[in-house]
Amino acid sequence: MFGFEQLPKEFDPRQKWPQCKSLNMIWDQGGCGSCWAFGAASAMSDRMCIHSKENEMQVHVSPENLLSCCFSCGFGCNGGFPGAAWSYWHRKGLVTGGLYGTNDGCQPYVIKPCEHHVNGTRGPCEEGGRTPKCHHFCENKQYNTKYNEDLTYGQKAYSVPQNEKDIMVELMTNGPTEGAFTVYSDFPNYKSGVYQHVAGSALGGHAIRILGWGEENGTPYWLVANSWNYDWGDNGTFKILRGSNHCGIEGGVVAGLPRYH
């Protein structure tokens, strides 16, 4: 068992598992409320690598496949449940699939990137996009593996207790998790520092991938990857106050472990 004394002051999985390239990847959910699928699929991809022999398994678990085919997960582009995403991976499996416009994996993402609360060349995001159709075949015609042979699975799915230390041990031992928090109107314009909600109304829940933790000027934080592309926030990531369930960030942490054939 770890005591708080044994836990490092800061932890970044990109330094502990440098071979796992997915840890550096920031996705773009586009004009679709699919954050729940991205938080899950990106952490699943990280864990597929972290738990593989010599970190050799470099795959992107497909958010597209999860978003379009997990009917028990909620409402597709209108929101979903992180815990259900992990149990779907365990029960049904998910194929591979990378970013929009790539030939990466069986089912790459089909919703195009857009600007999330920042000015740029991609055009502003419009919420409430249509959920893509579920297909049990590889949409990427240049991919040579059959759908059923491409499926990756979780061996189990679980919730992490709402406890700072338990979450830290989970991140350090098994890799990034999915989490969720309440977004207030003072969050979307975040650029740097440790986010703490001060003012503004609640805009809704948002699921993300928790990477690690640290301290900035004495303030403890979680290091989190968002799915709003690299030009949002701090190169696509943000820091949020750690240790007081700020905006509910510690209350909905879910994860799972990969299964290898």
Give each language-model segment a name.
Residues 1-261:
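Catalytic-core signature of thiol
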